[in-house]
């Protein structure tokens, strides 16, 4: 969840449960590519396993961000196709992608081919 599941929240959740899989808040691909929120990629090594949740629909951007995420040590990459926010949907990601299953499939295929993590 945006503005909630930051590294401090995830660290607290890890203290509460060693078994849950943790995810970042949704991070827009454009924000990562243009360096606006690279600090959101940071996590504490005690958070593992931890996945990153990307928001985007441009295949090349998603591939680039997937590679960045793998290099940072994430265990998994998740593509957000559920955020109902109007602001997010104006950027053509989130829940509006449910209407474009072929695009989602192409995005996921290219992301999978680019990295070795799920």
Protein language model regions, located:
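Glycine-rich, positively charged N-terminal anion/phosphate-binding segment
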Residues: 3-72
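Low-complexity, compositionally biased segments
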Residues: 9, 64, 81-83, 109, ...
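Short glycine/proline-enriched coil/turn segments at helix->beta-strand junctions
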Residues: 18, 73, 113-117
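Glycine-rich, proline-tolerant flexible connector loops at the mouths of alpha/beta enzymes
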Residues: 26, 30-32, 81-101
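Alpha-helix-loop-beta-strand connector modules within alpha/beta enzyme cores
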Residues: 41-51, 94-118
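Short beta-strand segments
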Residues: 53, 78-82
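A structural preference for short, pocket-lining loop segments at secondary-structure junctions
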Residues: 70, 77-78, 90
């Amino acid at each position: 969840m945006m503005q909630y599941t930051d590294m401090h929240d995830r660290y607290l959740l890890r203290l509460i449960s060693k078994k849950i899989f943790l995810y970042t808040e949704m991070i827009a691909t454009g924000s990562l590519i243009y360096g606006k929120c690279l600090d959101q990629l940071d996590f504490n090594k005690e958070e593992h396993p931890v996945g990153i949740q990307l928001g985007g629909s441009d295949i090349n951007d998603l591939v680039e961000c997937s590679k960045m995420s793998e290099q940072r040590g994430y265990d998994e990459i998740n593509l957000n196709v559920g955020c109902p926010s109007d602001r997010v949907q104006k950027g053509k990601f989130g829940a509006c992608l449910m209407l474009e299953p072929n695009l989602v499939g192409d995005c996921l295929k290219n992301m999978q081919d680019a990295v070795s993590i799920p």
